[in-house]
């Protein structure tokens, strides 16, 4: 190997040390399932999307089994606007008419999911896109929103009632990376758009995942947002449940997903900053990690 200067030699040495530091984490996670909720800037910034896809391929080639769950709220909003379809929200949820659902299905599986599958597959034949409709992966239950203290109908919006992981296990056994779009039928076969945070937690719990990672647009969990000194490195489920009512509205579904996962047997859940390139590898394979780690009380 040619060495052209001290800076390059130092850089090479640092890279070797980083790889060596990853060894115990690679051993711990080898053969384990890691569920990753893919959202936020990581979905819209081209550099971050490519880095995320590379992270998934890296994990797969290290013998770790990533499972990706994604939503696509901003992309759905953009397509509805482009098509001139009214977009209404109640209680923080998109009112999903049959017309809006058709757009959501097109965007989630046909656009967001396909783009990520293609980015991962640039590294090898790894990723397979599926939805909650495939092989009855998810069964949805209709949900409502609370507006002014009253339950309000929001259309074809659901929560996860049941999970059938057979198809995902088949993909994992074949060393593929499932990329899951969050659409699911109810017991009568009526398709609903389901919250991706909820879906990721339910899938992690049912798969017996080692970790659940939630990508966000903040550095982690703040107890007093936006005071930077209130960023939490680690918190248990009991303390987090007490903190839940005080959190910003956008963080609540992610925290609820973390709580569901760790109380359901997942050893740890992590809220990490998806704006950071290779944030998944930083969290999983370095001593310092990133974001906030949630564990059971």
UniProtKB/Swiss-Prot annotation:
One GO BP: arginine biosynthetic process via ornithine
Q: Which UniProt keywords apply?
A: Amino-acid biosynthesis, Arginine biosynthesis, ATP-binding, Cytoplasm, Kinase, Nucleotide-binding, Transferase
Q: Binding positions for substrate? A: 72-73, 94, 193
Q: Where is this site: Transition state stabilizer?
A: 37, 254
Q: What class of enzyme is it?
A: transferase
E.C. code: 2.7.2.8
Any GO CC annotation of this UniProt entry: cytoplasm
Which Gene3D superfamilies does this chain map to?
Acetylglutamate kinase-like
Where does it mainly reside? cytoplasm
State which pathway it belongs to: Amino-acid biosynthesis; L-arginine biosynthesis; N(2)-acetyl-L-ornithine from L-glutamate: step 2/4
List the InterPro entries hit by this protein, alphabetically: AceGlu_kinase-like_sf, AcgluKinase_fam, ArgB, Asp/Glu/Uridylate_kinase, NAGK-C
* Functional description taken from the UniProt entry: Catalyzes the ATP-dependent phosphorylation of N-acetyl-L-glutamate.
**PANTHER family xref list:** N-ACETYLGLUTAMATE SYNTHASE (PTHR23342), N-ACETYLGLUTAMATE SYNTHASE, MITOCHONDRIAL (PTHR23342:SF0)
Similarity field = Belongs to the acetylglutamate kinase family. ArgB subfamily.
Record-linked NCBIfam families: argB
- Write down what this protein is called: Acetylglutamate kinase
Q: Which organism is it from?
A: Mycobacterium leprae (strain TN)
């Amino acid at each position: 190997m040619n060495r052209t200067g001290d800076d390059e030699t130092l850089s090479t040495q640092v890279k070797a040390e980083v790889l060596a530091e990853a060894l115990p984490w690679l051993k711990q996670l080898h053969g384990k399932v890691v569920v990753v909720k893919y959202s936020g800037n990581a979905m819209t910034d081209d550099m971050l999307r490519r880095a995320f896809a590379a992270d998934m391929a890296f994990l797969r080639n290290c013998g770790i089994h990533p499972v990706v769950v994604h939503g696509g709220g901003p992309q759905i909003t953009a397509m509805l606007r482009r098509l001139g379809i009214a977009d209404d929200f109640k209680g923080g949820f998109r009112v999903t008419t049959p017309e809006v659902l058709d757009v959501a299905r097109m965007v989630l599986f046909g656009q967001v999911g396909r783009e990520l599958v293609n980015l991962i597959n640039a590294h090898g034949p790894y990723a397979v896109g599926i939805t909650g409709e495939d092989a009855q992966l998810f069964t949805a239950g209709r949900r409502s929103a609370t507006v002014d203290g009253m339950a309000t109908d929001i259309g074809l919006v659901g929560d996860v009632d049941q999970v059938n992981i057979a198809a995902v296990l088949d993909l994992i056994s074949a060393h593929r990376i499932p990329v899951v779009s969050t659409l699911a039928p109810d017991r009568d076969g009526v398709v609903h758009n389901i919250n991706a945070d909820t879906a990721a937690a339910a899938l992690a719990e049912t798969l017996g995942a080692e970790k659940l990672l939630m990508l966000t647009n903040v550095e982690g969990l703040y107890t007093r947002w936006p005071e930077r000194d209130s960023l939490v490195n680690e918190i248990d489920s009991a303390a987090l449940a007490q903190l839940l009512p005080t959190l910003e509205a956008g963080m609540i579904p992610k925290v609820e997903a973390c709580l569901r996962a760790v109380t359901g047997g997942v050893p740890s859940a992590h809220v990490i900053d998806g704006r950071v390139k290779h944030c998944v590898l930083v969290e999983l394979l370095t001593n310092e990690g990133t974001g906030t780690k949630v564990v059971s009380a």
